[in-house]
Regions:
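Extracytoplasmic/secreted envelope proteins and their assembly/folding machinery
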Residues: 84-86, 117, 129-137, 152-156, ...
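C-terminal solvent-exposed extensions
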Residues: 51-55, 62, 112, 256-259, ...
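Structured segments of extracytoplasmic/periplasmic soluble domains
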Residues: 68, 74, 107, 135-145, ...
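Entry/capping segment at the start of metal-dependent catalytic domains
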Residues: 2-97, 280
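Flexible, polar/acidic helix-loop-strand segments at domain edges
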Residues: 57-59, 160-257
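Extracytoplasmic
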Residues: 60-63, 82-87, 96-104, 115, ...
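Second-shell loop/turn segments in exported
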Residues: 74-78, 118-126, 141-146, 209, ...
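Solvent-exposed, acidic/flexible segments
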Residues: 58-64, 70, 79-83, 113, ...
């Protein structure tokens, strides 16, 4: 009969072995992640070129990033000198780990720098991430200093590594997605199978017909759709929906899948966030949750400016208030800066007065 003391020592020894294995496993995983992070492009931002407005009190306790998607799907494409057709502001509550995403519509009329009022997506092409961040800061009363940029090829690779996504589709979305798939497949070198259209065509082409399993090419093509009734507002909503699905699947994925995503995607990412900062975030990533998403401006009209149709915030001041309420829980005491007031007046002047604005709010997607 074994002695109690020996049993206790044996049990303690087993626990020590398990702890040692977990520690070694943790070091292995850490090492694997650390080596893969070297694949990410981390250019040094010229901080002297980043302009900010005020640091409003409601931003305390939050971390804010700018996320840019570049409409360039070649693996060898540079992640600069391109229009940022996806512009997302990510606000993170440092205490609750809740993340809120706000898309800035690509055709929004804003000052992209040096009193150049044009579509917001042009800022990145004019001056890279520094100018795009400065536009967000000065036009939306923000203080963003870090960004992440990806191209479409990265999205395709990540979604394929996750095993695809189950996305609800309308007839109109099926038609446009199949059309976009041709170009996306050619430019990424990835294959796809067209979604079979129902016959006969439904009377309401915008009505969701069902959920379809889509691969990377199809999911990215779905994100590019902007010619349904919901126009660009629907496109940005689709993008945020896909991001949410990707986050949920990544949380449930095994470590091998995560490593595969890193191998495929990291070479197609550019960010100002340092490797040390990323490594420090990793232990808490599972606790982050996308709590809500929205689009900016929330209230808008349309106007022809410089022979192009643009989205005009109605008004810029009111929309910035709503944005800060959404991102940071700002109360009625928050008032936009004088820069916002002056920019709003300039926008109204450029469009020829508030009476020239056309209310063509799209149908919700």
């Amino acid at each position: 009969m074994a002695r109690p003391g020996r049993k206790k020592r044996t049990a303690l020894f087993i626990v020590e072995i398990i702890c040692l294995l977990l520690f070694i496993g943790g070091l292995y995983v850490y090492g694997q992640i650390d080596s893969r992070l070297n694949k990410i492009e981390t250019p040094q931002l010229d901080e002297s070129k980043i302009v900010t407005n005020v640091t409003a009190p409601q931003m305390s306790g939050y971390t804010t990033y700018a996320l840019f998607g570049i409409d360039q799907r070649s693996k060898n494409a540079a992640l600069d000198a391109q229009n940022s057709d996806t512009i997302i502001i990510a606000s993170i509550n440092n205490d609750t780990k809740e993340v809120k995403l706000a898309s800035v519509y690509r055709d929004t009329l804003l000052d992209i720098g040096n009193d150049t009022y044009t579509k917001a997506n042009a800022a990145y092409a004019y001056g890279g991430p520094e100018q795009a961040i400065s536009m967000l800061n000065t036009m939306l009363d923000l203080k963003i200093t870090d960004y992440v940029t990806v191209n479409f090829n990265a999205m395709v690779a990540a979604i394929d590594a996750l095993g695809g996504l189950d996305i609800p589709l309308s007839y109109a979305e099926m038609v446009f997605m199949n059309d976009y798939c041709i170009e996306t497949s050619q430019e990424t070198g990835k294959s796809y199978t067209p979604v079979e259209l129902p016959d006969p065509k439904p009377e309401n082409e915008e009505e969701i017909l069902g959920t379809y399993h889509l691969n990377g090419v199809q999911s990215v093509s779905y994100c590019r759709i902007r010619y349904t009734a919901s126009m660009d507002m629907g496109r940005t909503e689709r993008q945020r929906r896909v991001i949410g699905m990707m986050v949920d699947k990544a949380k449930a994925a095994g470590i091998t899948t995560i490593f595969n995503i890193m191998d495929e995607v990291f070479p197609m990412i550019s960010t100002s966030i340092t490797k040390t900062e990323i490594l420090n975030l990793i232990p808490t990533l599972m606790g982050y949750n996308i709590a809500d998403t929205t689009g900016f401006p929330a209230k808008y009209k349309f106007a022809d400016v410089k022979k192009a149709s643009m989205v005009v915030a109605d008004t810029l001041e009111d929309n910035v208030k709503e944005l800060h309420k959404f991102l940071y829980g700002a109360d009625e005491n928050y008032q936009p800066s004088q820069n916002i007031v002056e920019a709003n007046a300039r926008i109204i002047e450029l469009v020829g007065g508030a009476d020239t604005l056309v209310d063509q709010s799209p149908i919700a997607s």
